[in-house]
Swiss-Prot record:
Descriptive protein name: Bud site selection protein 4
PROSITE patterns: PH_DOMAIN
Gene name per UniProt: BUD4
Gene Ontology molecular function: any one: GTP binding
GO cellular component: cellular bud neck contractile ring
Length: 1446
């Protein structure tokens, strides 16, 4: 607006002047005079600028009063005008001089007259009045030409030439022969710039100044002028303006290698192993390789001279540096390609070096010669394809060693003939496939010994079977099978030697097998000529051959799997990885053909006896009533079990077993429905025998989707084929699903249950069921019985149907129960077949009729019944036949100090004591069995699980909830509830017949029933419930205490899985609870307060005391402070002569229930007066005027010192010097005045010890002085006090020792509340899990709130009172010597952390600036340091102080 107003005012003034002078002006006869208002502002400005440049000497200023804006040379718009040189220098100078003279001579001309003079001087011919606009344009062009010419001339004059001489530089390495001085060098340069002014003569100084002024014209306008030139003027500016020097294009540029590429190469070289030589690299085209490093690659090795072509490829010298080694190096360098960038090197030198390396390697024999027309293999080769044969050879050697060791161990222990034959088959078949001549020879020697041992074992088997009443038909079959196996074994030995000699030159056949699965049979035909694939192998031979169960070699593979099939297994594993399954029929043909090839014998086809082996076997099994079809076993299974575990006995021949694991792509591993399981009758297989029985039972039904010859199907009478068909049954590439199998395979990370399926009686789950007990000795004994029954099934037929029931009549009266060794007390009852356990197992059965009396009579027993019941259960759990010496019992008893026992809730239960038929029952045996440690049991479990998993590759079979147990927690069912009993420890002197009084019973409340389908995790720990009853009597809490150590063990009742509670910890808990109750503490919330708080009294002083004669007695005072418990006195201090006391003493008094009042006493001691000044009046006679006149006297008063008769101070003080006392009642009215605030108080000092003086002038003794009657109490002064009461609300509060420190703490608290800051921070942690976000944070005292960076909604609120410390880069210190960890310091360099009291850490970082981040760190650290002053009393005290200040 100001600019527009200025322009309008100027235009108005010009118009007014033009109107005033229009009548007086006369037109000139020689031309037309143009009015000034028609020229225009733009043209007028150019005219003024022109006149200013050409009239610099006359100091012409177009507008002297205006505030002109000077333009810089860079901003001069004249530089933008075209530069034309249409005039000569002489003519231009003449015109300028003429124009200057005209204008300078007529200083009083108007603007129009000046314009006319300018037109006349230039000889301009103006057009008529009708073309005024053309005149203006012509005039403008003239001015532009003049300005351009003057600027060009000035620029040309500024350029000068500078010549100078420079002395040459002496060489760095001086030559003694050369004594020449360095030559002088002439240098000529063009110099221009403002410094030339200083080089000019003095006479030209004025012209140069005028010239410099002309280059900076003054604008006549008052409006500020802004140049519209671009800011980035260097972008498009010419080279002259930017003063940049460029390099000519003809000079070649040298491409320098980047630092990154150099570092990469150096890193690769440093990562090379010390045994390898550094690789040398040759770049064919240096220029292209340096410009595109990413395109470098590693081609095949070539020994011809083609590396000099323009291929821009990096060649590798043929040294020991291989591709797979380089891949390892590349993986250690992040963000680096496999092809590194390499420094440009000399091509010739590198070629020489490469040739030298090649020659050296060839001389050493490292590099083999390759034909010129062929290329070496690529650098990056596939190790899996090149090393398959090596892997198989190593693996076969290892397996051979393990097999030989196993054979030695089994021969030494005289194992059965089946296990020996199985090992020999594995050994010989392995030797046939081994690639080492020495190993085959060794195996041949071993097999010769094996053959001899086989014969011995065969004879022993004949004796064994004949002595055990085996069926004669089965006996003949076993002998025939043994003979067949011996023949096959001997033939395999020769076959292995021949096959090795025949296939020594064809060791690459196995690699050919890996290329194509369809070429397996063709490969067999190439390696073994003369064998026809259509040959029919007799069934008798086929059944004796080792069966191939193709399992993943890296997971679980049975030890008894024939090693002759290792190549087929490897192929199958590779096919499984590629998700392509081979045909089952084809694999069976391969196995059959390969077995015949190994034997190198020609078998004549014989008509096989249809189902001869199976029928015989089934007839024998059907004759045994105690053995069901679910427990059938085969001779093959017997061999597998004997080789897989050392503790499993020899099994009778049973039907063939299918593979154990399921490699089914359709199988659901995570199915937990257990639809085919009985929840109450689940089995937990503990050994191979139980697993095989389970499989035989669950695989009876054959799925119609399975082929008759599939290796995954069950080979029964209906599905087994007598002849192996070479035609596959189906073209389906995946393995069929076994729909009849009801168990699922689980990984090894679960806990395997050790209860045997043979000893679980599912129909009678009872508390007295001994088969649910699980201890070491009983487990071993039961396993021995199982082995005997399975080895000799003919003797266990009658025993399988026998169930022993022993009932003891319950007695109401408490008395010991002893176990007698009399067999007459035992009653044997035969039960029906439907109540017997499968596989001929035995169980002690408790009749259901006794369960009715169980609840009614159990309460009448003592608490120690739980201990005796545990002994009874352990008695069932142990086998009484165990022959253990007394020395072993004593040794075990001394070692095992902690005895496991189980507790049962106090309910009346009828029970029975089965004792068995064995007459030799010793109490020491029972004691030894009870002393078994839990650790020993766990060790046995872990050893057996490890043995089973290692030998057989089996996992854990999941069971139902009723059979899951964790640790040593045993569970049983009672009244429809699943109960787990935690074992506690008890002393060694327990007698199973001793019961305690029923008065000390600890009752346990009943729990709600748990669903039978509930499956608890074995890793879930549920804390035991302490079953204690508390009786409230007279407002006090009491607890019934346990009388003995055995009764102090707590009872833990849980629904599924519980944790073990030891008696020691339970006793400690009971003792701690008892002490707490006796002390009257009921917990943290109801914990009594230590005191009411702290009372601060600041004694300021007293008013003037009503005490005379202070100066004469020289008194001293002291203050006595009595709170009812302690008495405190101050030092004796001189009393002021004015009678005022300035105390300035502070006392802190903890207020509790015993303190009701405070007594403050002022005590004074003084110096007793011995002499005193007495005023005496004397009469002095005056002379008589008359002789008989009256005698006249004058009086005169005098002070006479005499001994003191009595002192007034003697009647004012008590014996101890007490003079004044005030009593402060500590009541609520006082606390209300001074609670959490400082208040002025005043208390009267009363003298209660003043006595009445007696009127007699006689001197009173000191003893009689205190017997005088006392005066009534009177006020002698006032005590001024400042008081403050800090009330306690928590025992954790800490009060300062003085009121002054309390005030300073409040000040610190206030300063903490005043700390504020806000800004953006990056947060990691807290509510952000594994991520980092930018938020806007506000710090207000102890509250740090984070807001969303856009919406500004609060997202997180951090209580700084919970922060323990703030960690920055300077706070990371470790070690005793406070040595800083440099790594942590680097990581914490750009962030800081808040560490909370629970260990949580939140990291913050500020990206804006380091100063801002340091400010955040310092403020947060100050807040955390001031947290120590953050107590409840501080906040209240601070609030009251603010109110008082207002």
């Amino acid at each position: 607006m100001e600019a527009e107003t200025t322009v309008d005012s100027l235009l108005k003034e010009i118009d007014m002047e033009m109107e005033m002078q229009s009548g007086n002006d006369v037109a000139q006869s020689n031309g037309y005079l143009l009015p000034l208002q028609e020229i225009g502002d733009e043209t007028m400005d150019m005219l003024v600028q022109y006149n200013t440049e050409n009239n610099a000497n006359s100091n012409v200023n177009a507008n002297a009063n205006a505030n002109a804006n000077q333009w810089n040379k860079v901003d001069d718009p004249q530089d933008l005008l075209p530069m034309e040189n249409n005039y000569d220098d002489d003519e231009e100078q003449g015109d300028e001089s003429d124009t200057t003279n005209l204008l300078s001579g007529n200083k009083h001309l108007t603007e129009e007259e000046s314009e006319q003079v300018l037109v006349d001087s230039k000889n301009l011919v103006l057009p008529p009045s009708s073309s005024k606009s053309n005149l203006i344009n012509n005039l403008k062009q003239v001015v532009e030409d003049e300005v351009s010419d003057s600027q060009l001339s000035n620029d040309m004059d500024d350029t000068r030439t500078l010549n100078f001489s420079v002395k040459g530089t002496e060489p760095l390495l001086a030559d003694e022969l050369q004594d020449k001085e360095p030559d002088m060098i002439e240098v000529s340069t063009i110099y221009d710039g403002p410094d030339m002014i200083s080089m000019a003569d003095d006479s030209d100084t004025e012209d140069i100044d005028l010239l410099s002024k002309a280059k900076k014209p003054v604008s006549p306008s008052k409006i500020p002028i802004t140049n519209a030139q671009t800011i980035n003027y260097f972008k498009d500016a010419p080279v002259e303006d930017a003063k940049l020097q460029t390099v000519p294009d003809d000079i070649p540029l040298e491409t320098k290698q980047t630092t990154v590429s150099n570092d990469i190469l150096s890193n690769v070289e440093t990562l090379l192993p010390p045994t390898l030589e550094r690789p040398s690299f040759v770049i064919s085209n240096l220029k292209e390789a340096s410009q595109s490093v990413e395109n470098l690659g590693f081609p095949d090795y070539e020994e011809d001279s083609q590396s000099e072509q323009e291929t821009s490829v990096l060649h590798h010298t043929p040294t020991d540096f291989h591709a797979h080694e380089f891949e390892v190096f590349a993986t250690e360098l992040p963000d680096i390609n496999v092809t590194p960038s390499i420094k440009p090197i000399d091509i010739d030198n590198n070629c020489e070096h490469e040739n030298r390396l090649v020659s050296e390697e060839e001389s050493k024999g490292v590099i083999s010669s390759v034909p010129e027309n062929e290329n070496l293999p690529a650098v990056k080769s596939n190790p899996s394809s090149n090393s398959i044969s090596d892997m198989l050879e190593i693996r076969q050697e290892n397996k051979l060693d393990e097999t030989l060791n196993m054979i030695d161990h089994q021969l030494s222990s005289n194992k059965s003939i089946d296990s020996v034959k199985t090992v020999s088959d594995n050994n010989i078949s392995k030797s046939a496939n081994d690639g080492s001549v020495e190993d085959v020879a060794d195996s041949g020697k071993e097999t010769s010994d094996i053959a001899r041992n086989i014969e011995e074992s065969h004879n022993s088997l004949i004796n064994l079977t004949s002595g055990n009443n085996f069926d004669q038909s089965m006996h003949n079959d076993l002998i025939e099978e043994s003979n067949t196996r011996v023949n096959v074994t001997e033939s395999d030995i020769t076959a292995s030697e021949d096959s090795f000699n025949g296939s020594h030159d064809q060791n690459s056949s196995l690699n050919n097998l890996t290329k194509n699965d369809n070429g397996i049979q063709q490969n067999l035909e190439d390696n073994h000529t003369g064998i026809q694939p259509e040959m029919v192998v007799p069934e008798e031979v086929t059944t004796t051959l080792p069966e191939v169960n193709i399992l993943p070699a890296s997971e679980n593979m049975l030890e008894n799997t024939s090693e002759s099939e290792i190549s087929v297994q490897f192929l199958q594993n590779r096919d499984n990885e590629d998700k392509v399954s081979s045909d089952p029929q084809l694999e069976e043909n391969i196995r059959s053909t390969e077995t015949v090839m190994n034997t190198q014998e020609t078998f004549e086809p014989k008509p096989a006896k249809k189902n001869q082996y199976t029928d015989r076997e089934i007839e024998v099994l059907n004759s045994q009533k105690d053995i069901s079809e679910a427990t059938d076993n085969s001779a093959v299974n017997s061999r597998i079990s004997s080789s897989a575990s050392n503790f499993t006995p020899v099994l009778p021949p049973l039907p063939k077993l299918e593979k154990l694991s399921i490699d089914d792509p359709f199988d659901d591993e995570f199915e937990t429905s257990n639809e085919s399981m009985q929840m109450k009758n689940s089995v937990k297989p503990t050994d191979y025998l139980s697993i095989w029985h389970l499989q035989e039972q669950t695989t009876k039904a054959v799925s119609p989707a399975l082929s008759s010859n599939s290796q995954f199907s069950y080979n029964s009478n209906s599905t087994k084929s007598s002849v192996a068909s070479p035609v596959p049954a189906t073209a389906f590439k995946f393995k069929p699903k076994i729909v009849s199998r009801s168990k699922y395979y689980y990984p090894d990370n679960n806990i395997q249950q050790e209860q045997s399926m043979d000893f679980i009686y599912t129909k009678l789950p009872s508390i007295l069921d001994p088969m649910r007990r699980n201890t070491i000795n009983s487990k071993k004994i039961r396993q021995t019985v199982i082995d005997k029954r399975k080895s000799h099934p003919s003797f266990s037929v009658d025993e399988g149907n026998t169930i022993t029931e022993v009932n003891i009549e319950p007695e109401v009266k408490v008395q010991p129960i002893s176990i007698e060794n009399d067999s007459s007390s035992l009653k044997a009852n035969n039960q029906d077949d439907n109540e017997s356990c499968s596989s001929g197992s035995q169980a002690f059965v408790t009749p259901s009729a006794t369960m009715d009396n169980f609840d009614s009579q159990f309460n009448e027993l003592g608490t120690s019944f739980e201990n005796d019941l545990e002994n009874v259960l352990n008695y069932f759990d142990k086998d009484i036949n165990t022959n253990t010496s007394s020395d072993l019992i004593e040794e075990t008893t001394t070692k095992n100090q902690a005895l496991p026992t189980s507790k049962v809730w106090s309910e009346s239960v009828d029970y029975s004591l089965p004792t068995g038929e064995e007459p030799n029952v010793d109490h020491n045996i029972m004691k030894k069995l009870l002393n078994t440690e839990n650790s020993e049991l766990n060790e046995c479990r872990s050893d057996q699980e490890h043995h089973i998993i290692d030998n057989a590759g089996l996992g854990i079979w999941r069971s139902t909830a009723n059979d899951i147990a964790t640790g040593n927690v045993d569970m049983f069912a009672l009244n429809g509830r699943d109960i787990s009993i935690s074992k506690s420890e008890m002393t060694n002197d327990i007698d199973m017949g001793i019961f305690s009084d029923k008065k000390s019973l600890v009752h346990t409340p009943e729990l709600s029933p748990v669903k039978s389908t509930h499956v608890g995790s074995p890793f879930k720990v549920i804390s035991p419930k302490k079953n204690t009853q508390k009786d409230l009597k007279d407002g006090t809490t009491a607890e019934k205490r346990v009388s003995s150590e055995s009764e102090a063990a707590q009872i833990s009742i849980m629904s599924a899985v519980g944790e073990i509670t030891n008696k020691d910890t339970a006793v400690v808990d009971d003792a701690s609870n008892k002490d707490n109750i006796d002390a009257g503490q009921v917990g943290n919330e109801g914990e009594p307060i230590v005191d009411k708080g702290l009372l601060y009294l600041h004694l300021q002083g007293t008013t003037k005391l009503s005490l005379a004669g202070i100066n004469a007695h020289h008194p001293k005072y002291s203050i006595e402070f009595d709170n009812g418990k302690n008495v405190v006195r101050t030092d004796w201090t001189e009393l002021d002569s004015r009678g005022t006391i300035s105390l300035n003493k502070e006392f802190e008094i903890p207020i509790d229930q015993s303190i009701n009042k405070l007594i403050i006493t002022l005590m004074i001691k003084y110096t007793r007066l011995t002499n005193e000044l007495v005023e005496v009046t004397k009469r002095i006679p005056i002379g008589k005027k008359f002789p008989f006149g009256k005698m006249k006297y004058r009086t005169e008063t005098q002070f006479v010192e005499r001994s003191t008769v009595k002192d007034e101070w003697d009647y004012l003080f008590a014996r101890d010097g007490s003079f004044g006392r005030c009593e402060i009642l500590l009541d609520e009215s006082l606390f209300e005045k001074i609670r959490f605030k400082e208040q002025d108080l005043s208390f009267d000092l009363l003298n209660k010890w003043s006595r009445l003086q007696n009127n007699s002038s006689s001197k009173v003794t000191q003893e009689a002085l205190y017997d005088l009657p006392r005066r009534p109490a009177y006020k002698v002064g006032s005590l001024k006090v400042k008081g403050c009461f800090l009330e306690r609300v928590s025992n954790d509060e800490k009060f300062p020792v003085s009121l002054k420190k309390a005030k300073s703490i409040v000040e610190k608290y206030r300063s903490q509340q005043d700390i504020t800051k806000e800004g953006y921070l990056l947060q990691e942690g807290g509510d952000l899990s594994s991520q980092m976000k930018n938020r806007f944070f506000k710090l207000n005292g102890v509250e740090l709130v984070g807001y969303h960076e856009v919406s500004m909604k609060p997202k997180i609120r951090i209580n700084m009172l919970k922060v323990v410390k703030v960690i920055g880069k300077d706070d990371v210190v470790t070690g005793k010597d406070n040595v800083r960890n440099f790594t942590t310091w680097v990581l914490m360099n750009d962030c800081f952390q808040l560490v909370f009291d629970d260990g949580e850490v939140i990291t913050f970082s500020d990206e804006s600036s380091l100063a801002d981040e340091q400010s955040w760190y310092m403020k947060l650290k100050e807040v955390v340091e001031l947290n120590a002053f953050h107590q409840p009393w501080v906040k209240r005290f601070s609030e009251n102080m603010i109110i008082n200040d207002i």
